[in-house]
Amino acid sequence: KSTVARHIAHQLGLLYLDTGAMYRALTWFVLSQGVDPTDPLAVAELLPTCDIKLTSQGKDQENPQPPEVWVNGQSVTQAIRTPEVTAQVSTIAAQAAVREALVKQQQQYGVQGGIVADGRDTGTHVFPHAELKIFLTASVAERARRRQRDLAAQSLPVPELSELETLIAERDRKDSSRDISPLRQAEDATEVITDDLSAEDVIDKICAMYQEI
């Protein structure tokens, strides 16, 4: 979904907000500090010391890049995509203090409008009154294959497909069953199943929807 959101923002001249990267950045910081990600009090104590920023990586017209992700002035753009972070991000994201802090930051980006935001609770909780909501979905197997390609493109270690499928399925389970802002489709969102669609097909489809509002 980040690839699609990034290209849509580029095509429409809007700001791209990768909310998932913010949760990954905090997860990376928690792990880097040796804090137990399952300890909400310890994680909450770290929140004031974790300054997360997203900046543009340039103006590549053909291939818009993901935002550069910074934690306390250190670039963590690649570090937040590792399997270690992926395995813990749902645990961190389910914590009330974490969601309250990061949702406030995300909503500040949206005050003026004109953004494309992606994230697992973006349409239901972060921006419930958005003009256009898309619920992108694909099978676990397809998402695992895409994750392998993404990691390889970033020259990061690429786990076995079965390992990624397990990680993704477990993350879905955690995110769908959490008490705070669970993963679900907003009632006014349009579902787009992407298994048999290229990224370009999905981008064109959503851009056409945007032009109709």
Model-flagged regions — what are they?
Residues 7:
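Active-site signature of alpha/beta-hydrolase-fold catalytic machinery across serine-
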Residues 20, 73, 102, 116, ...:
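Residue-level signal for inorganic ion chemistry
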Residues 2:
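Walker A/P-loop
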Residues 11-80:
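N-terminal phosphate/diphosphate-binding loop that engages ATP/GTP or pyrophosphate donors
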Residues 77-153:
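ATP-dependent NMP and nucleoside kinases share a basic, alpha-helical "lid"
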Residues 16, 133-135, 189-192:
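Conserved beta-strand scaffold positions in the cores of enzyme catalytic domains, especially
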Residues 121-122, 128, 134-135, 139-145, ...:
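Anionic, Ser/Thr-rich low-complexity intrinsically disordered regions
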Residues 68-77, 86, 145-154, 173-213:
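NTP-dependent small-molecule kinase module
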